[in-house]
């Protein structure tokens, strides 16, 4: 892309927060906390490489009007608004997955099905995540229902770092060293996406 110093900006979105814990792990880990920890580590990595990083949330909170009727919708709208106002090179939303079969595991990247750029980025990111687990056979996946993917005006991907329903992965995702490894892979993935 044509990245200049002026617009070397990435938005990192840590899914959930506050009254909305997201998925709850088999080890009782809350998705909202894991998301923020990983995003903070990505932020550090990107800043080291000269990128400016805007976080949709820096602490454990929901966004938007806390008095609003449907807090979740206000929260999602507020996230989209931050992304569209900032107009970064890309937005990356950090989430964790969950499934009723606890054997299911592995990171997976989602993109908006009508975005060529989103698809390219998601595939590149999925490849970057192989450094965390080279046995992960998951492919980047199109989606046309996620509000965040539909409403953002810049290339946006969602990275589901792993399954909190898988005991082994849930343990890893709450481990600082593993979070750092995951964050490093995502940082490299972001840079590969936007600088090529």
Residues covered by each model-derived region:
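A generic structural signal for alpha->beta connector loops
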Residues: 50, 106, 136-137, 153
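Active-site-adjacent substrate-binding region
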Residues: 118-142
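Catalytic-core regions of hydrolytic enzymes
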Residues: 1-11, 16-123
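Active-site-adjacent mobile loop/cap segments within catalytic or ligand-binding domains
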Residues: 86, 100, 137-196
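Active-site phosphate/pyrophosphate- and oxyanion-stabilizing loops and adjacent acidic/basic residues
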Residues: 81, 127, 146
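Active-site/binding-pocket entry motifs
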Residues: 18, 62, 131, 164-165
């Amino acid at each position: 892309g044509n990245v200049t110093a002026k617009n070397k900006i990435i938005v990192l979105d840590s899914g959930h927060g506050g009254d909305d814990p997201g998925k709850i792990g088999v080890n009782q880990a809350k998705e909202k906390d894991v998301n923020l920890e990983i995003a903070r580590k990505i932020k550090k990595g990107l800043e080291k490489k000269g990128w400016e990083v805007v976080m949709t949330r820096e602490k454990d909170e929901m966004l938007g009007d806390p008095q609003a009727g449907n807090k979740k919708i206000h929260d999602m709208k507020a996230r989209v608004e931050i992304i569209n106002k900032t107009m970064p090179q890309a937005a990356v939303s950090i989430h964790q997955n969950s499934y009723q079969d606890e054997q299911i595991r592995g990171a997976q990247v989602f993109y908006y099905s009508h975005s060529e750029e989103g698809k390219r980025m998601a595939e590149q990111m999925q490849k970057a995540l192989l450094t965390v687990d080279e046995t992960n056979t998951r492919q980047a996946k199109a989606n046309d229902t996620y509000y965040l993917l539909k409403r953002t005006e810049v290339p946006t991907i969602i990275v589901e770092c792993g399954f909190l329903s898988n005991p082994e992965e849930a343990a890893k995702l709450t481990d600082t060293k593993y979070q750092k490894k995951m964050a490093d892979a995502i940082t490299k993935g972001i840079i590969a996406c936007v600088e090529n």
